[in-house]
Amino acid sequence: MYDPEKISFVDVLRWFWEAHDPTSGMGQGNDRGTQYRSGFYYFDDEQKQLIEASKKAYEEQLGRPITTEIAAASDYDQYGGLWYYAEPYHQQYLSKPGARPYCSAQPQGVSLAPFESWAPEGLKEKHAPKLSENFWKKHAPKRGCSVVQEPNEPIPDSDM
């Protein structure tokens, strides 16, 4: 869930690509299986265009194929078309102190190219990033495990 008043869909995309290894196939780290695969599900054609364009740009920067599943949310009916929140103990799982001895997400330390360089025509102004480069310098995922071992606190509005 995100607040489009504070961040744009392309900010969410940037965080998504940079916060994990999207080339790891059916898993993350030592966790293997379809339930651990990377996936991004869209709700309209504009989101699909933005996801596909950002994927292509990030794939070029990584220099290897991205294996993230991209599909319409409405087509994802493995569970009867229903979406569920994770169990309470899985909410913010990696940010819980001592919850994991390792970070399975494995951020690659590669930043997504500037939006202007990959934005689909006609969508640049409507979906411009809202988060500043100062935000990304301070809060972007770092290579390896960037999960904090302290309570997960909201990012202050002053950092946005």
Regions found by a protein language model. Give the residues of each.
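Flexible coil/turn and secondary-structure edge motifs
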Residues: M1-M160
